[in-house]
Amino acid sequence: MSTLAAPTPSNPRWLFGPVSDLLFGCGIAYMGIFALMTVAAEQVEATVPITSFLLITLVIAAPHYGATLLRVYESREDRRAYTLFTIWITAGLIGIFVTSLYSPVLGSLWFTLYMTWSPWHYSGQNYGLAVLFLRRRGVTIEPRAKQLLYASFILSYAIVFVAFHTGVSSTGYGPALPQGDSYVFVPIGIPLYMANALYAGLGGLYLLTTAGTLFLLARGSNLRDLGPALVLIASQALWFAIPGLARASGTLQGIAPLSNLTAPYIGLWIAIAHCVQYLWVTTYYAARDENHVGRTRYLTKALLAGSAAWGVPALLFSPGLLGNVPYNMGLFMMVAATVNLHHFILDGAIWKLRDPRLAKILLRSDDSVGPRLDRGGSSFVRPLFWATGFVCLVIFVVGDLEAQYGVTRAGERGDAARIEKATRRLARIGRDSPKLHHQLALLAQRDGDLVRAETEFKAALEVYETKNVWHNLGTMYLSQQRFDEALHAFDEALALDPSLAQTRVHASTAALSLGQRELALDHLKAAARLAPNDRGLRRRIVELGGEPNPPGQALP
């Protein structure tokens, strides 16, 4: 087992050493990804496709969350010190999470808060590490320089904030893969003309504050002492300020990492860089303060703790247990939002350089800070917690592998048997989804097995009702001349989304076949209002004896 390489008094300038500190702590590793994307974006995306981030984030993001949990909950001393956060605020977050599963409005606002807060959290970490390196190297940071440095990081975040909240955001920052039909990002809705003015103002102020910071710091120090902080300032610019302004203005779109087209993909790399950076500093802190004897043991515990934090709510609140929203239709998003917001709040409470113990470890070079208090806890609680974390880790690995190989890739080659096997396995671990049964139903229809198709359509609806499943089930019934059942299916689809023009056309056909002429006409008129340029609909309305033009609509 490798031990943590704590700095000695002869090398107080680094935490682990120049290579790892610059690569992982300051962000040069991400700069390498940025450079690779610039010259070979297609090859990078082919080598590391976006679907692979499910497992990548498991390995890196889970211990990143787990490290915070260990920092706050493992020691009795810390549990007592942060009772407000560890008990009361945590309970409040759990309450919002549970409520959001039954309220799409609250869930959407919750997800929006998480996405909006994420770059602020990243920016705060970059700023804190920049100050840490300056102070470890004995650089005198006069108040004005510190204020300008802080303002520079805030302004770079503000650029992303405006991008998020101008209409529908497409900047793609944030560590989650947004997958779901129940929840959406809800932007404030900044008007475009106002956003353009804000971009110009924020961009100008960002350049001024950054230049002022560099000027004031350079007056009393040298490049060698300023190096790590300068790299962190550059990382912040590459993460937020430069891509935010480039995408907003439509400039530099030929550079892949700055393009709107690759924003979601590059945003995942930024999230990974942040998680690695966090693990880098927390691993150092744990070795010095919490007496962990080895890096491997500490990171394993962090991985299990993070896996439990993600896995337990996802399993308990899956459909069939305590929840009603499938994993890939909103539950994942709500778990991600809650776990991350909990992490953000705890981080804001525990990582303060004005904390004497924290400052002694991160800002000084002495090797010991005194013994920790007893961690306490029942003898059976800890093994149970680690076992739970291990089970959740296995569930994540199995779930992600089955989703990628048993569903996505099997679907590409039309392998219904493999998808069916994956569906059964995913259902056992709380990841049953109407999309899986819907896909099996469509494949059964393709093969002419309409009995099996109907079974899978109904299985999909038992998991979670969606407009697409109801529509396709109704279409199958219509082709079988089961008009009563078809009309019922179309009505259910329209109850979920009244704006489905094609569903209304099919419902009209079913109603007319049942002799319900007025109902058929009503559906056609509603479809014509949704598709005012469709002359075929108007002809059918006339054929049924209706008005040629829907009310309020003129012929083109």
What are these language model-derived features?
Residues 408-411, 442, 475, 509, ...:
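Residue-level recognition of tetratricopeptide repeat
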Residues 446, 479-480, 513-514, 543-547:
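Register position in tetratricopeptide repeats
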Residues 428-432, 464-465, 498, 532:
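Short coil turns that delineate tetratricopeptide repeat
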